[in-house]
Protein backbone atom coordinates (compact mmCIF):
# COMPACT_ATOMS: atom_id res chain seq x y z
CA UNK A 1 0.00 0.00 0.00
CA UNK A 2 1.44 3.34 -1.01
CA UNK A 3 0.85 6.43 1.18
CA UNK A 4 -1.84 8.92 0.17
CA UNK A 5 -1.08 10.73 -3.12
CA UNK A 6 1.76 8.37 -4.01
CA UNK A 7 1.95 6.74 -7.36
CA UNK A 8 4.04 4.60 -9.66
CA UNK A 9 5.60 6.90 -12.25
CA UNK A 10 8.08 6.67 -15.06
CA UNK A 11 9.58 9.33 -17.31
CA UNK A 12 9.05 9.74 -21.03
CA UNK A 13 9.64 6.81 -23.36
CA UNK A 14 9.75 4.29 -20.48
CA UNK A 15 7.74 1.16 -19.62
CA UNK A 16 5.97 -0.13 -16.50
CA UNK A 17 5.25 -3.77 -15.57
CA UNK A 18 3.13 -4.81 -12.57
CA UNK A 19 2.96 -8.58 -12.00
CA UNK A 20 1.44 -10.68 -9.22
CA UNK A 21 0.89 -7.62 -7.02
CA UNK A 22 -1.72 -5.99 -4.79
CA UNK A 23 -1.49 -2.20 -5.23
CA UNK A 24 -3.28 0.63 -3.44
CA UNK A 25 -2.04 3.65 -5.38
CA UNK A 26 -2.83 7.10 -6.70
CA UNK A 27 -1.98 6.03 -10.25
CA UNK A 28 0.33 4.08 -12.55
CA UNK A 29 1.55 6.35 -15.29
CA UNK A 30 4.11 8.30 -17.26
CA UNK A 31 3.76 11.94 -16.22
CA UNK A 32 5.03 14.19 -18.99
CA UNK A 33 3.54 17.46 -20.24
CA UNK A 34 4.84 18.89 -23.50
CA UNK A 35 4.26 22.30 -25.06
CA UNK A 36 3.47 20.85 -28.49
CA UNK A 37 3.02 17.49 -30.23
CA UNK A 38 6.62 17.82 -31.50
CA UNK A 39 7.92 17.59 -27.92
CA UNK A 40 5.56 14.78 -26.88
CA UNK A 41 6.71 11.78 -24.90
CA UNK A 42 5.30 8.27 -25.12
CA UNK A 43 4.89 5.52 -22.55
CA UNK A 44 6.01 2.49 -24.55
CA UNK A 45 4.21 -0.25 -22.61
CA UNK A 46 2.23 -0.63 -19.40
CA UNK A 47 1.53 -4.21 -18.38
CA UNK A 48 -0.62 -5.29 -15.42
CA UNK A 49 -0.75 -9.08 -14.98
CA UNK A 50 -2.36 -11.20 -12.23
CA UNK A 51 -2.70 -8.16 -9.96
CA UNK A 52 -5.25 -6.21 -7.94
CA UNK A 53 -5.08 -2.42 -8.35
CA UNK A 54 -7.03 0.15 -6.35
CA UNK A 55 -6.28 3.53 -7.96
CA UNK A 56 -7.46 7.13 -7.89
CA UNK A 57 -5.85 8.42 -11.08
CA UNK A 58 -4.66 7.50 -14.53
CA UNK A 59 -3.34 4.13 -15.63
CA UNK A 60 -1.32 5.03 -18.73
CA UNK A 61 -0.06 8.46 -19.78
CA UNK A 62 -0.80 11.71 -17.94
CA UNK A 63 -0.24 15.25 -19.16
CA UNK A 64 -0.73 17.23 -22.35
CA UNK A 65 0.42 15.35 -25.46
CA UNK A 66 1.45 12.36 -23.30
CA UNK A 67 0.67 9.24 -25.31
CA UNK A 68 0.79 5.55 -24.53
CA UNK A 69 1.66 2.96 -27.16
CA UNK A 70 0.41 -0.24 -25.50
CA UNK A 71 -1.53 -1.15 -22.35
CA UNK A 72 -1.98 -4.84 -21.54
CA UNK A 73 -4.16 -5.94 -18.61
CA UNK A 74 -4.38 -9.72 -17.99
CA UNK A 75 -6.03 -11.62 -15.16
CA UNK A 76 -6.30 -8.50 -13.01
CA UNK A 77 -8.82 -6.45 -11.05
CA UNK A 78 -8.76 -2.65 -11.33
CA UNK A 79 -11.07 -0.50 -9.22
CA UNK A 80 -11.43 3.21 -8.57
CA UNK A 81 -10.36 4.36 -5.11
CA UNK A 82 -13.03 6.70 -3.77
CA UNK A 83 -10.65 8.05 -1.07
CA UNK A 84 -8.89 10.31 -3.54
CA UNK A 85 -10.54 13.66 -4.33
CA UNK A 86 -9.72 13.74 -8.04
CA UNK A 87 -10.98 10.35 -9.22
CA UNK A 88 -9.80 10.97 -12.79
CA UNK A 89 -9.11 7.32 -13.47
CA UNK A 90 -8.65 6.69 -17.16
CA UNK A 91 -6.98 3.67 -18.69
CA UNK A 92 -5.21 5.19 -21.71
CA UNK A 93 -3.69 8.47 -22.93
CA UNK A 94 -3.68 11.93 -21.40
CA UNK A 95 -5.14 15.24 -22.60
CA UNK A 96 -4.42 15.98 -26.26
CA UNK A 97 -2.72 12.56 -26.44
CA UNK A 98 -3.40 9.30 -28.20
CA UNK A 99 -2.91 5.61 -27.52
CA UNK A 100 -1.97 2.67 -29.72
CA UNK A 101 -3.73 -0.30 -28.13
CA UNK A 102 -5.48 -1.20 -24.90
CA UNK A 103 -5.94 -4.95 -24.44
CA UNK A 104 -7.97 -6.16 -21.44
CA UNK A 105 -8.36 -9.90 -20.98
CA UNK A 106 -9.66 -12.15 -18.16
CA UNK A 107 -10.01 -9.10 -15.90
CA UNK A 108 -12.48 -7.06 -13.85
CA UNK A 109 -12.54 -3.29 -14.35
CA UNK A 110 -14.72 -1.06 -12.14
CA UNK A 111 -14.25 2.66 -12.87
CA UNK A 112 -17.56 4.37 -12.22
CA UNK A 113 -16.46 7.99 -11.92
CA UNK A 114 -13.93 8.95 -14.58
CA UNK A 115 -13.75 12.74 -14.93
CA UNK A 116 -13.49 14.63 -18.27
CA UNK A 117 -12.31 11.57 -20.21
CA UNK A 118 -13.49 8.07 -21.02
CA UNK A 119 -12.71 5.45 -18.40
CA UNK A 120 -11.01 3.48 -21.17
CA UNK A 121 -9.55 5.49 -24.09
CA UNK A 122 -7.87 8.84 -24.67
CA UNK A 123 -8.06 12.24 -23.00
CA UNK A 124 -9.95 15.15 -24.50
CA UNK A 125 -9.05 17.32 -27.51
CA UNK A 126 -7.05 14.65 -29.32
CA UNK A 127 -6.18 15.28 -32.96
CA UNK A 128 -4.05 12.54 -34.39
CA UNK A 129 -3.67 10.53 -37.56
CA UNK A 130 -3.43 6.98 -36.31
CA UNK A 131 -5.52 3.91 -35.80
CA UNK A 132 -6.05 2.80 -32.22
CA UNK A 133 -7.60 -0.33 -30.78
CA UNK A 134 -9.45 -1.21 -27.58
CA UNK A 135 -10.03 -4.92 -27.02
CA UNK A 136 -11.98 -6.34 -24.09
CA UNK A 137 -12.13 -10.16 -23.89
CA UNK A 138 -13.44 -12.58 -21.25
CA UNK A 139 -13.82 -9.71 -18.79
CA UNK A 140 -16.34 -7.89 -16.61
CA UNK A 141 -16.21 -4.14 -17.17
CA UNK A 142 -18.27 -1.40 -15.52
CA UNK A 143 -17.20 2.09 -16.57
CA UNK A 144 -18.64 5.60 -16.52
CA UNK A 145 -17.49 9.02 -17.69
CA UNK A 146 -18.87 11.77 -15.46
CA UNK A 147 -18.68 14.41 -18.21
CA UNK A 148 -17.37 15.29 -21.66
CA UNK A 149 -17.53 11.98 -23.48
CA UNK A 150 -18.26 8.29 -23.72
CA UNK A 151 -17.18 5.70 -21.16
CA UNK A 152 -15.09 3.84 -23.76
CA UNK A 153 -13.37 5.49 -26.75
CA UNK A 154 -12.44 9.06 -27.65
CA UNK A 155 -13.12 11.97 -25.30
CA UNK A 156 -14.82 15.27 -26.00
CA UNK A 157 -13.57 17.35 -28.93
CA UNK A 158 -11.37 14.59 -30.37
CA UNK A 159 -10.99 13.83 -34.05
CA UNK A 160 -8.88 12.86 -37.06
CA UNK A 161 -8.03 9.38 -35.78
CA UNK A 162 -9.81 6.07 -35.76
CA UNK A 163 -10.54 3.80 -32.80
CA UNK A 164 -11.56 0.17 -33.27
CA UNK A 165 -13.40 -1.24 -30.24
CA UNK A 166 -13.64 -5.03 -29.98
CA UNK A 167 -15.64 -6.70 -27.18
CA UNK A 168 -15.52 -10.50 -26.98
CA UNK A 169 -17.25 -12.83 -24.51
CA UNK A 170 -17.49 -10.06 -21.88
CA UNK A 171 -20.04 -8.28 -19.74
CA UNK A 172 -19.67 -4.53 -20.28
CA UNK A 173 -21.69 -1.71 -18.70
CA UNK A 174 -20.63 1.68 -20.08
CA UNK A 175 -22.27 5.06 -19.44
CA UNK A 176 -21.09 8.32 -21.02
CA UNK A 177 -21.31 11.80 -19.51
Name each model-derived stretch.
Residues 1-115, 120-145, 152-176:
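Surface-exposed loop/turn motifs in large extracellular/passenger domains
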Amino acid sequence: KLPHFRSIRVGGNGSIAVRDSDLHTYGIFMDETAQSPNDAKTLKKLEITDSTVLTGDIIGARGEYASVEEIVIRGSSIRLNEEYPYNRCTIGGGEQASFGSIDIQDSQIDITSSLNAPAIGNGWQVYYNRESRIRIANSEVSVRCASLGPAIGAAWDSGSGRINIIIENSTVTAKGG
